[in-house]
Amino acid sequence: MSKTYATLGELKPGNFIMIDGEPCKIVEMSKAKTGKHGSAKAHVVAISLISGAKKTFVAPVDTRVEVPIIEKRVGQVLAITGDSVQLMDMETYDTFEVPLPEEEELKSRLEPGVEVEYWVMPPGVYKIMRVRGGK
């Protein structure tokens, strides 16, 4: 999957960053100038988009970090089998399976024929983010 690079000082809350090989959304960020001869440091608190775990990262603000390029796509639910959902992409008509979301509210709204927004994230992870339309 694709990713790009940015300096840590350019990022702000709401941006995405790769921490420990997982795409994360920055929820809190603070910058502190250290000593007379030290460089400024950035303290980043982020939530993993894959596992939902809270991750922290401290580095100089001029550090180059990986920024994931997340594709937001639309698909239709074809079937729900056990702990996976079969989706069809609404543009390419490709069919594939993604894990069933862990959020109860989202899981309860999934049924065959419903359109969903799913994200394709590095390293090739698919995740259903929300149900589209009013059901």
Curated annotation (Swiss-Prot):
Matches recorded under CDD domains: S1_aIF5A
SMART domains: eIF-5a
Transmembrane annotation, as ranges: none
Sorted UniProt keywords: Cytoplasm, Hypusine, Initiation factor, Protein biosynthesis
GO molecular function: ribosome binding; RNA binding; translation elongation factor activity; translation initiation factor activity
Compartments (UniProt record): Cytoplasm
Similarity comment: Belongs to the eIF-5A family.
Name of the protein in question: Translation initiation factor 5A
Species name: Ignicoccus hospitalis (strain KIN4/I / DSM 18386 / JCM 14125)
